[in-house]
Amino acid sequence: MARHTQDQTSVHWREGGKASRRTFLKSTVGAGSALASFSITRSGWNAKSRPRWQSHTVARIPEGYQVAVADVNGGGRLDVLALSSQKNIVDWYQNPMWHTRSVTTSTEDNISLAPLFRRGYPVQGMALASGFHLDHPEQGGDIWWAQPSASLDAEWSLTRIGRIPASHRLRWADLDGDGRVELVDVPIVGAGSRPPDYSVPAPIMWFQMPETLLTGHTASAGQQSNNWIPHLIDESLNIVHGVLVMDWNGDGRDEILTASTQGVNLFESKGRGAGLQWTKTLLSPCDQSSDRYHGASEIGVGKVQGHRFLATIEPWHGNKVVVYTRRTRGFSERHVIDTSFNNGHALVCADLDGDGNDEIVAGYRGPGTSLFIYHSTDERGTRWERETLDTDMAASCVVIADVNGDGRPDIVAVGSSTANVKWYENLGFA
């Protein structure tokens, strides 16, 4: 088993009183919402507390690229979904025995998946992006709506709902606060981009779901495809790699944060439906001094002592984990907390130990294949301690979810060269 160590002071923690209670505030978690929101209460926990972790193998998958969780079969447990970027594999694994079932084997060069399984929501299924070709983006970019079949063992029915070259990240978001979600599609580059600069900006889009799906009236595949209406959000950013959907400003609608060559940008909307109007705000330019690529490629948001911070991997597929804390003029205070990454590709923020402060979970795909947890050691989020979670995880994607239903946030990750899907069980206090 890969080692699990703390890179600095070794500490053990004990629970004061009975097990803490964590309650999901949202019933859907996926690659598009890497963190399920928890309401956490605890007593008797000190600032040096650390959860214990136990790794479990979910599956082997060649060149694993994206992972998500959702209650696919309605069994009350979060199942795991994953795809391979090299093989025509899009699978889901049924919790708790992790029986492998195929979503589809008919798509190639898969790149992103966004499950939609919300309790009480009128439609269930998954958005899937395939045909990814970074160096020749116009050769692909297919976007699919996949609906489960009546049999758990049957592949899902696919409807192509759009084609946007270099589609790279799919996310569900309630963009106008009406309780219905829209599909956000973020290409990494624009059509016509070529290496090494990839200079054509990416058209960030959102799709309105067909009314026929939302009302439960069955339509033909062709009608469904035509009714997924695309709308442009922005077309000014290059190499848009990281995407985070969250209610940034507490207005009851989801905002979009991106990590790109230009740094971290926030997109906020006003209006309703097809009339949405967008405002872009630069939160941080990030790394603009590297020789080849600039900006950031992953973005996470957390809080320490109630103060928000940004966490990034810099630059594109870079070697640095960076934290930005807020000063009078935005997130202008930069703290490089790790420079050891080799092809950094996974990052999420979450309160893993219930102390009210968020940790950072981040990993990389290159030699060393490691996944780490970073713990803040001061009240401002300027100093961090690294804990090694796994050295057998070439982390391409990581999400946080309560996998076993014990109320604790667990970690789920997929590895590329390590060809694995794992979940890391939060065992609580020793």
What does each model-found stretch correspond to?
Residues 13, 17-23, 28-430:
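Beta-propeller-forming repeat regions
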Residues 1-19:
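N-terminal secretory signal peptides
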